[in-house]
UniProtKB/Swiss-Prot annotation:
It comes from the Bacteria. Belongs to the ABC transporter superfamily. Methionine importer (TC 3.A.1.24) family. Residues 2-237 form the ABC transporter domain. It comes from Legionella pneumophila subsp. pneumophila (strain Philadelphia 1 / ATCC 33152 / DSM 7513). CDD domains: ABC_MetN_methionine_transporter (cd03258). This is Methionine import ATP-binding protein MetN. One of its GO terms (molecular function) is ABC-type D-methionine transporter activity. It holds the Pfam family NIL. ATP binds at G34, K35, S36, G37, A38, G39, K40, S41. The gene is metN. It is an enzyme of class 7 (translocase). It catalyses: L-methionine(out) + ATP + H2O = L-methionine(in) + ADP + phosphate + H(+); D-methionine(out) + ATP + H2O = D-methionine(in) + ADP + phosphate + H(+). PANTHER family: AMINO ACID IMPORT ATP-BINDING PROTEIN (PTHR43166), METHIONINE IMPORT ATP-BINDING PROTEIN METN (PTHR43166:SF30).
Amino acid sequence: MIELCGLKKSFSGKLALNDINLFIQEGEIFGVIGKSGAGKSTLLRCINILEKPDEGEVVIDGQNLMSLSRKDLALARHKIAMIFQHFNLLNSKTVFDNIALPMRIQGIDEESIKQKIEELLPVVELTDKKDAFPSQLSGGQKQRVAIARALSCSPKVLLCDEATSALDPATTDAILSLLKKINELYGITIVLITHEMDVVKRICQRLSVMVDGKIVETTALSNIFNKPESLARKMLYAQISPELPTCLTRRLADYATEKPLVRLFFQGEEATVPFISQTSRELNMDINILLANIDRFDGVTCGVLVVELTANPLLLEAFINRCEQAGITVEVLGYVLPDGL
């Protein structure tokens, strides 16, 4: 559906995109994640040639956009919609007129425009806001208008540029649910860029990680746990791992005591097995659970535990071996000193 081949883009001699090669399947929700300045927005803008790449090919639905005339490119863009962090609504126009704008620019007749908007308003849950102005809407409602406007010309591709980063958590959840519904309802291919792993894990089937203008990893979310060195996996674990309280970190030493502090990452079936209680009995060791969190994405349950063990080096080694045999990732954070030292 979308194929990027050897894409390069530079600004003032500095590479923003460096040899990007990527294939996005028709009908999937694909995430691109990375820190600010990684090149995510530039990549997205190159997909619809808002930024023209210096080198490479952008093939959408079998058509190389880089080789099209200006007129043919304008026609091809009718099937590529885009929403942004900022909603870009016309404040002097009603919800109806904001959604109608792209269709009017294309010369679609008013009766067809009315029918399309009446179809879209229930989808974005704005049936009662047709005559409202942007100043009368919440941030989430404004983004819903922007989404309806993007869908008005029946695109095959929807590009989302940090579309939830200006929204509160509850509204973000609602917008992500809406995007997922749109994907299921219309079969639209969605490309979503973000710096938040939580957004990716909520709705994406596959993702790419960008670092300094390069794609360093592309994977299905369900395969993350099979790749111990996966950067995406590390980003996920960092998100779900509870932060250690100061009262604990100030008591940690890097030399061995008989109170090792260990972080455990579970996934899949391992997250539902009573591993801690079984191991405590079998190794005859005390295991004190200090922090825990569990989450679920793409049908996979994953969790993290921070535990304090009562174990000498040999017993700690036996514990780590048991974890590894069970498919549990282990990280020794340090050794707990007695309180007051």
